[in-house]
């Protein structure tokens, strides 16, 4: 998979600012891994061990069906939504730290409004970010806004189920 470089640039900027930008950085890593197809196939054949529960504990060579949480589409939707919220919070945190570092005096509500009208990140969801920063221009992190806090709390149980099922099924979900 090709890259335009914006994710990589964002990840480097986050590291320069000592700011976690985990979801974007993991997306960059996923692209890099995607390009290593022959190595991924070989590794999968060498490390395809399954999990098993014996006496209430995990052991090797188990059947994955032991851990069937019966995830619903709604569980996955909620988990993706929570990850999206975290990604936006991390991105705006990076903007805030860079603005402080470089003396940019950025208006985050306006940035979200501009992006909503047509940029890399067009989304109706950006209106909620605009509203959060209109309410509190000095908002330290989007996760401290009432809307974002409530949405994370609502999504948290499904998010945990999806991540647990992924881990127990041998499916890496680093951006979750």
Locations of regions flagged by a protein language model:
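NAD(P)-dependent dehydrogenase/reductase Rossmann-like domain
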Residues: 1-52, 58-61, 70-176
């Amino acid at each position: 998979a090709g890259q335009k470089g914006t994710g990589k640039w964002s990840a480097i900027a986050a590291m320069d600012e000592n700011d976690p930008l985990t979801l974007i950085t993991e997306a960059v890593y996923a692209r890099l891994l995607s390009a290593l197809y022959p190595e991924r196939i070989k590794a999968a054949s060498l490390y395809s061990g399954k999990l098993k529960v014996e006496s209430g504990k995990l052991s090797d060579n188990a059947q994955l069906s032991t851990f069937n949480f019966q995830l619903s589409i709604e569980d996955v939707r909620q988990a993706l939504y929570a990850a999206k919220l975290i990604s936006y919070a991390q991105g705006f945190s990076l903007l805030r730290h860079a603005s402080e570092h470089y003396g940019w005096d950025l208006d985050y509500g306006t940035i979200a409004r501009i992006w909503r009208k047509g940029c890399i990140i067009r989304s109706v969801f950006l209106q909620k970010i605009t509203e959060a920063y209109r309410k509190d221009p000095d908002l330290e992190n989007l996760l401290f806004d009432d809307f974002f806090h409530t949405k994370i709390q609502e999504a948290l149980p499904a998010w945990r189920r999806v991540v647990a099922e992924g881990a127990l099924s041998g499916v890496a979900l680093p951006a979750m």
